């Protein structure tokens, strides 16, 4: 007896729920002991964005004091990071203050984890479904994107590894930025590889850019795809509106703080009393945050430098070398972006997405160094790793390739588990 369409639909939904539940369980079981989500804590005392949200509630832009990377400009202290986390904290603190005046401005940990980390498995799963994977394989790839990349140790900086590097990193803003950006990048992929509503890709761009500024370069494939839609004008308008909003708020905040919409304030971290000022001083005595001279060294670390492997009384250990480590060693799956280059190049959408990662990578390579918090991995690879995985997804599904991918996954999980104790 052939089941009715309604019965089949119910069965598919039940299977989908079970697969997602298993994906979340796998992430919790694998990452939980080292990431320690229950220990995540964020408040104005340990995070610049949270401190700025408190300042917004008081009707000001200035911070009460210097903590972490903050800008000292005209005698005032300002947050210099993109605004997404500030907006999230502002909404939460405003709501809790309205409900219970005098309540401490501390994020309720389960809700904090739910907003920052919980969307990623679901959205990564949908991104890989849109990329061409079936229901089961999309879950495997989503797990790889989380446990098989440096997203694992980056998230560990907020929980288990925070104690190893000092309490100031219990809400290390750089880690939170990378994690939030994954949500935005996944949404971009879901839309551009799916129905191409364009406003949804624009929303993903906003989330990613308000977390990591270099992700704004993904507006290039969004606008290019909008230009090539059958209803060009409508698609461009739907894409341009969120792109404009993405620019407007950070630009307005920059203008209000530093008098220039293009001035992020980052160079004002390095005032004359900052011991790291020498890192960014050029021959002219001025601060230079970007430079072509940084490219060779950073490129070597991102793509060539091997990890350090050694044996202790506890067994085999892997750690960083220099201290960054090339992405291929921890995540060998990315080698397929080179092996399958001709394949993804023939797909116009995948091609333009992959091409957009080139300026994203190059801007990161021009950034002054060293890159903090990257022992055994290179955290800037998170700005494009999800894009690369989506580009090669259709060619990971063959019988032979699946076994190769599973072997890569086993190695990657072992690798990032091994370095999870290295801040």
Regions found by a protein language model. Give the residues of each.
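Membrane-proximal envelope and lipid/glycan-remodeling enzymes
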Residues: 1-423
């Amino acid at each position: 007896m052939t089941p009715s369409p309604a019965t089949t639909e119910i069965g598919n939904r039940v299977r989908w729920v079970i697969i997602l539940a298993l994906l979340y369980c796998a992430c919790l079981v694998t990452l939980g002991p080292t990431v320690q989500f229950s220990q995540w804590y964020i408040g104005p005392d340990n995070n610049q964005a949270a401190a700025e949200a408190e300042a917004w509630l008081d009707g000001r832009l200035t911070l009460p004091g210097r903590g972490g990377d903050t800008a000292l400009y005209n005698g005032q202290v300002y947050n210099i990071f993109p605004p997404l986390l500030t907006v999230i904290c502002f909404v939460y603190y405003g709501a809790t203050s309205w409900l219970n005046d005098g309540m401490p401005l501390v994020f309720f940990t389960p809700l904090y984890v739910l907003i920052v980390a919980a969307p990623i498995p679901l959205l990564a799963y949908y991104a890989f479904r849109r990329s061409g994977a079936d229901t089961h394989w999309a879950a495997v790839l989503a797990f790889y994107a989380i446990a098989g990349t440096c997203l694992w140790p980056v998230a560990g900086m907020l929980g288990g590894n925070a104690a190893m590097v000092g309490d100031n990193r219990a809400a290390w803003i750089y880690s939170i930025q990378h994690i939030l950006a994954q949500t935005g990048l996944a949404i971009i992929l879901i839309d551009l590889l799916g129905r191409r509503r364009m406003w949804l890709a624009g929303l993903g761009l906003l989330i990613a850019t308000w977390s990591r500024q270099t992700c704004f370069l993904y507006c290039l494939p969004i606008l290019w795809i909008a230009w090539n839609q059958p209803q060009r004008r409508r698609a461009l308008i739907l894409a341009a509106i969120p792109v404009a909003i993405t620019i407007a708020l950070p630009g307005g905040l920059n203008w209000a703080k530093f008098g220039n919409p293009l001035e992020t304030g980052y160079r004002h971290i390095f005032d004359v009393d900052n011991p790291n000022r020498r890192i960014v001083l050029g021959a002219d005595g001025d601060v230079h945050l970007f430079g072509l001279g940084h490219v060779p060294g950073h490129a070597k670390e991102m793509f060539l430098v091997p990890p350090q492997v050694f044996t202790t009384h506890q067994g085999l250990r892997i750690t960083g070398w220099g201290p960054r480590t090339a992405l291929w060693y921890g995540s060998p799956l990315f080698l397929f972006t080179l092996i399958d280059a001709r394949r993804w190049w023939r797909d116009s959408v995948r091609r333009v997405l992959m091409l957009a990662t080139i300026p994203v990578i190059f801007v990161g390579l021009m950034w002054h160094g060293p890159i903090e918090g990257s022992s055994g991995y290179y955290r800037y690879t998170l700005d494009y790793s999800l894009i690369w995985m989506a580009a090669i997804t259709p060619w990971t599904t063959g019988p032979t390739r699946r076994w190769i991918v599973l072997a890569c996954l086993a190695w990657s999980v072992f690798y990032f588990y091994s370095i999870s104790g290295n801040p």
